[in-house]
Amino acid sequence: MSRVGKKPIEIPAGVTVTVNGNTVTVKGPKGELTRTFHPDMTITVEGNVITVTRPSDEKHHRALHGTTRSLLANMVEGVSKGYEKALELVGVGYRASKQGKKLVLSVGYSHPVEIEPEEGLEIEVPSQTKIIVKGADKQRVGELAANIRAVRPPEPYKGKGIRYEGELVRLKEGKTGK
């Protein structure tokens, strides 16, 4: 059996899980997430534990088993604790600010770049060079953070741009003059 797939998922207090066929709804203090899983996977809720079982040991069932369990665990953690991804701006004059819900980036273009977060996601700007993306859905938090980073990814010579917090940017050697 898949080592990831056979681990049961504990449901923390304040989180409710509803299974309707192959659609699972998880409600918690940070929000509500719904996802439809592959019909071959059997998801059962007993007390405060979720278990995922598979019909056979075929390769695609083994793969689906671990994936389904991980996605469910991420949903449960997302509605109870939430996810956040931090980004930092490196570069002279690179600034981030908030106008209402919109994130406004001035990162060396002739115009400020505005990014509107989707429903269920939140952007915080604790300082002009730091951005924090928060939300219950791990995938959507990561996707929004990646979209913000894509506005001005770190360049390889000086390292200027938007990077994830703690991301190491390998710098290249410049051309040596004669």
Swiss-Prot record:
Subunit structure: Part of the 50S ribosomal subunit.
Alphabetized NCBIfam families for the sequence: L6_bact (TIGR03654)
Highest taxon listed in the record's lineage: Bacteria
The keyword Ribonucleoprotein is assigned to this record: yes
Record key words, sorted: Ribonucleoprotein, Ribosomal protein, RNA-binding, rRNA-binding
Protein family per UniProt: Belongs to the universal ribosomal protein uL6 family.
Keyword Ribosomal protein among record annotations: yes
InterPro entries xrefs: Ribosomal_uL6-like, Ribosomal_uL6-like_a/b-dom_sf, Ribosomal_uL6_a/b-dom, Ribosomal_uL6_bac-type, Ribosomal_uL6_CS
Function: It is located near the subunit interface in the base of the L7/L12 stalk, and near the tRNA binding site of the peptidyltransferase center. This protein binds to the 23S rRNA, and is important in its secondary structure.
HAMAP family: Ribosomal_uL6_B
Name of the molecule in the record: Large ribosomal subunit protein uL6
GO MF assignments: rRNA binding; structural constituent of ribosome
GO biological process: cytoplasmic translation
One Gene Ontology cellular component annotation held by this UniProt entry: cytosolic large ribosomal subunit
PANTHER family the UniProt entry points to: 60S/50S RIBOSOMAL PROTEIN L6/L9 (PTHR11655), LARGE RIBOSOMAL SUBUNIT PROTEIN UL6M (PTHR11655:SF14)
